[in-house]
Amino acid sequence: MNKLALYCRAGFEKETAGEITDKAAQLGVFGFVNLKENSGYIIFECYQAGDADRLARELKFEQLIFARQMIVVGDMLQDLPAEDRISPIVAQYQALNPRHSSDIFVETPDTNEAKELLTFCRKFTVPLRSSLKKQGWLTKSERAKGSMGLHILFVRPGCCYVGYAYNDNKSPFFMGIPRLKFPAEAPSRSTLKLEEAILTFIPEAEEKKRFTDEMTGVDLGACPGGWTYQLVKRGVFVYAVDHGKMAASLHETGRIEHCPEDGFKFQPLKRKTIDWLVCDMVEQPMRISKLIGKWLINGWCRETIFNLKLPMKKRYQEVQLCLAYLEEELEKQGFWFKIQAKHLYHDREEITVHIAVMGRKPQ
């Protein structure tokens, strides 16, 4: 097994390929990509034996923007016999001897064509899990050091990749997709983007400390209030900045103040630092990056989650430019900061970015 399979949104295979090629090279790992447009996954084959496993251990999954999941795989199994699909899969795993495995996930790419396989995948998981346990596998806790999850990626009927991923360096979600329910009281479906962003970027154990009823937030381009809703739900008082109307249900909470202003011109009150800045405005990504940079550098906010709408072409390059700009500006000012970005399931032609400023470096 010396390949990586990376799941992604259909249509973003080239961005995923460019990113894994760059990140692998930074670790001294080289290889080539096999991809099919709109397939929802890519294969990165390493030149050196053992390098795929090294990437699965050392390349931090949270650093990948476009990948929803990252697993080590071998050659594709094709034309699995209908009367016994399990034996060829077990045979591939026997070469690995995954004694430190915790569970099995039988998945597909997130495409309309592949989704037709999901019913089969669910049914197939039960006998496969039983067979793997008979081999003495799937016995470890997923929290055990060095434990791995076993993953099968069915790309079409009878054809699959057999693989694994380390539990401390992968998405915890089936197919890399969190299953979120749209709250009936939320003003718009965009609320799911911020909910997924918080789930992705903020450790669950820290969420109640990072969002409290003593905090204030600003939502730039807030109307009708999908993102504001997520902050208010967590107790934050929000200045909702937009010329449009906010949902009446949000006004009724008493936890928002509507500021009918231009999001690019709005400034917080002097000597008041905002805890959370959120922004989901439709604008050129570099213009949004400069706006967010201004808020952080001026000390107007401590933490921010925002979306960057991507162009039709050179999307990965545009992301690199925007993130490099923000990192460079914050470095110039001597800030300690953490920056993460992800192409979330609820994002479309956009990515979501999180930046937390932790103070300034000593001079």
From Swiss-Prot:
Keyword list, A-Z: Cytoplasm, Methyltransferase, rRNA processing, S-adenosyl-L-methionine, Transferase
Molecular function as annotated in GO: S-adenosylmethionine-dependent methyltransferase activity
SUPFAM superfamilies found in the cross-reference section: S-adenosyl-L-methionine-dependent methyltransferases
Cited InterPro entries: RlmM_FDX, RlmM_THUMP-like, RNA_MeTrfase_FtsJ_dom, rRNA_MeTrfase_M, SAM-dependent_MTases_sf
Pfam families linked to this entry: FtsJ, RlmM_FDX, RLMM_N
Gene Ontology biological-process entries: methylation; rRNA processing
UniProt enzyme class: transferase
EC number: 2.1.1.186
Cellular location(s): Cytoplasm
Reactions listed under catalytic activity: cytidine(2498) in 23S rRNA + S-adenosyl-L-methionine = 2'-O-methylcytidine(2498) in 23S rRNA + S-adenosyl-L-homocysteine + H(+)
Active site annotation, chain numbering: K309
Annotated residues for binding of S-adenosyl-L-methionine: S190, C223, P224, G225, G226, D242, D262, D280
GO cellular component annotations of the record: cytoplasm
HAMAP family recorded: 23SrRNA_methyltr_M (MF_01551)
Record note on quaternary structure: Monomer.
Function (record text): Catalyzes the 2'-O-methylation at nucleotide C2498 in 23S rRNA.
PANTHER family per record: RIBOSOMAL RNA LARGE SUBUNIT METHYLTRANSFERASE M, RIBOSOMAL RNA METHYLTRANSFERASE FTSJ DOMAIN-CONTAINING PROTEIN
Recorded family membership: Belongs to the class I-like SAM-binding methyltransferase superfamily. RNA methyltransferase RlmE family. RlmM subfamily.
UniProt name for this protein: Ribosomal RNA large subunit methyltransferase M
Gene name in the database record: rlmM
